[in-house]
Amino acid sequence: MTKVLVLSDTHGYNDRWLAVMKLHNPDVVIHAGDHLTTKKFMDQNATFWVAGNHDVVGEEIQMFELEGIQFVLMHGHQAPRHDLKQWYKMLVDQAKSYLCDVLIVGHSHIEHYETIDGIQVINPGSLEIPRNPRKLPTYCNLNLSQGRISDLTFHFPRD
């Protein structure tokens, strides 16, 4: 089993990110952009990461495989943000060309999980600037096992 921490939109506030990493001790850390920090910090603290619309370092899209699962990672600013349902559909349409099983995005600052056209879409929300109705910061943990996501949990830290 592989333990994965997924986060996004930390916007340069790294203390909570580092505390969450210490709390969960993940095997893999995925950051979906708007990190607003240095390449060195990202390389030291994230296994896979992309640039968001506020970042000056990083690739826009990463593709990788974990436990036999094909992932595409992008921030989400690659599609115009209309209503969220339409926005996710546009991102999935882009991701289809990569033949992925899972698409991880950020940008909206709102946690989300659903399957669209056979692709699992995960948005961990924002650890620092949440826009969900409760205005709580969010991140996500995944457990990967035998070619599938065996557990997906959103967390809402209050400290």
Swiss-Prot record:
It comes from the Bacteria. Keywords: Hydrolase, Manganese, Metal-binding. GO terms for molecular function: hydrolase activity; metal ion binding. Mn(2+) 1 binds at residues 9, 11, 34, 109. Its EC number is 3.1.4.-. Binds 2 manganese ions per subunit. It holds the Pfam family Metallophos_2. Mn(2+) 2 binds at residues 34, 53, 75, 107. Its cofactor is Mn(2+). PANTHER family: VACUOLAR SORTING PROTEIN VPS29. Belongs to the metallophosphoesterase superfamily. YfcE family. This is Probable metallophosphoesterase MPN_126. It comes from Mycoplasma pneumoniae (strain ATCC 29342 / M129 / Subtype 1).
